[in-house]
Amino acid sequence: MAETKVILTKTVSNLGHSGDVVDVKSGYARNYLFPQGLAFAWTKGAEAQIVAMKRARLAKAVATREDAVAAKAAIEGTTVEIAAKVSESGKLFGGISNEAIAVALSDKAAVNPKAIEVETIKTTGDFPAKVALHPEITASFFVKVVAE
């Protein structure tokens, strides 16, 4: 099968980051990457676009790294308390979602719910959690679940 060189416009997992030139199968490019706006075809004239995208990504990474360091200082080692409905045996009705944890963390720093790593919470108690603030920076904290 023929391969095509494409320039990624957004980060694609298991493929590359924005601005990277990658070789992919023609069908993958034509049927997925191009329609989703994740890439465009590589041409000699697109080299200038690649350089501009990489410069923009580097500038954004420096800014977000500084923000991530500040957010880590605010979050690291803290305990977030979440109240939930509990049965008499101490089990939750449902569970605690990453979105609920992100809302509870919002007074300290804005975090992406998808970046939070925590075990499934089905009972009251303290649970260790991590949040990836930047590809190189993670913060550890605790989630305390109490009865309403």
From Swiss-Prot:
The keyword Membrane does not apply. PROSITE patterns: RIBOSOMAL_L9. GO terms for cellular component: ribonucleoprotein complex; ribosome. GO terms for biological process: translation. The keyword Transmembrane helix does not apply. Keywords: Ribonucleoprotein, Ribosomal protein, RNA-binding, rRNA-binding. One of its GO terms (molecular function) is rRNA binding. Pfam families: Ribosomal_L9_C, Ribosomal_L9_N. Belongs to the bacterial ribosomal protein bL9 family. Binds to the 23S rRNA. NCBIfam families: L9 (TIGR00158). This is Large ribosomal subunit protein bL9.
